[in-house]
């Protein structure tokens, strides 16, 4: 596992995301509805739905809202056939970028995604151009815990890897299908999970300086502002020193 903090890069963007909470909720609900529609409403038998529920909870969505979205999906939703599409490309500084979309119209989606890359000095690549650099994983964050006890609980719950960060927080990596089970095991052991989500972990990182980092963040902002875009993954590394200058 690459020795970097995925959560640190997420935190750099939390303030901006909080300002777009309404749009984030819309995208979370769309994923909940689609996951339930495709795989049923039982979170125990539907890993995609369980992952969607965990992510919604991490973003402070209420259980009532989550349950209503699941019920919509089980009932067939609104009749729209949503499909997951992954677009790959290169961002500023040679960073690898993967864009996960949920859409009923591929032409509309690509017309949103391609200009974002172009305007930020990047370019949209072909399928497989950067995907080989990423692995789909579950990521769980626990803040300030007894390292030995948490490690034991995480391993017993089925975690693949555990990384302690400089600030004392612990990042726990799992097979994406096991995210819910591992999260449950950690919580049963008495630890508070701050965040749990399915993500794409890069095998190599690209260090970004104070000139390049804002360009990548602008690209991410533009992509996430697209209605069809659910998640944006990249291998840009933004140090605390560079982040402080942004």
From Swiss-Prot:
SUPFAM superfamilies: YebC-like. Pfam families: TACO1_YebC_N, Transcrip_reg. GO terms for biological process: regulation of DNA-templated transcription. One of its GO terms (cellular component) is cytosol. InterPro entries: Integrase-like_N, TACO1_YebC-like_2nd/3rd_dom, TACO1_YebC_N, Transcrip_reg_TACO1-like, Transcrip_reg_TACO1-like_dom3, YebC-like. GO terms for molecular function: DNA binding. The keyword Transmembrane helix does not apply. Gene3D superfamilies: 1.10.10.200, 3.30.70.980. Keywords: Cytoplasm, DNA-binding, Transcription, Transcription regulation. It comes from the Bacteria. NCBIfam families: PRK00110.1, PRK12378.1, YebC/PmpR family DNA-binding transcriptional regulator. Belongs to the TACO1 family. This is Probable transcriptional regulatory protein HSM_1763. It comes from Histophilus somni (strain 2336) (Haemophilus somnus).
């Amino acid at each position: 596992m690459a020795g970097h903090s995925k959560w640190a890069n997420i935190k750099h963007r939390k303030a901006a995301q909080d300002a777009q909470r309404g749009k984030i909720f819309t995208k979370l609900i769309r994923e909940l509805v689609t996951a339930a529609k495709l795989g049923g409403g039982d979170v125990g038998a539907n890993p995609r739905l369980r992952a969607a529920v965990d992510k919604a909870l991490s973003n402070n969505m209420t259980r009532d809202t989550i349950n209503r979205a699941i019920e919509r999906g089980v009932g067939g939703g609104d009749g729209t056939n949503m499909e997951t599409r992954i677009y790959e490309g290169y961002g500023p500084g040679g960073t690898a970028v993967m864009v996960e979309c949920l859409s009923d119209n591929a032409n509309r989606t690509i017309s949103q995604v391609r200009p974002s890359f172009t305007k930020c000095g990047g370019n949209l690549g072909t399928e497989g151009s950067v995907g080989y650099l990423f692995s789909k994983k579950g990521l769980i964050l626990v803040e300030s815990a007894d390292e030995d006890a948490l490690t034991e609980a995480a391993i017993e719950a089925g975690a693949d890897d555990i990384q302690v960060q400089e600030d004392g927080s612990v990042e726990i990596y799992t097979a994406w299908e096991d995210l819910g089970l591992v999260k449950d095991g950690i919580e049963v052991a008495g630890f508070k999970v701050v965040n749990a989500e399915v993500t794409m972990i890069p095998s190599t990182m690209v260090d970004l300086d104070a000139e390049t980092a804002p360009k990548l963040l602008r690209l991410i902002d533009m992509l996430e502002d697209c209605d069809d875009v659910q998640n944006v993954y990249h291998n840009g590394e933004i140090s605390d020193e560079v982040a402080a200058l942004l």
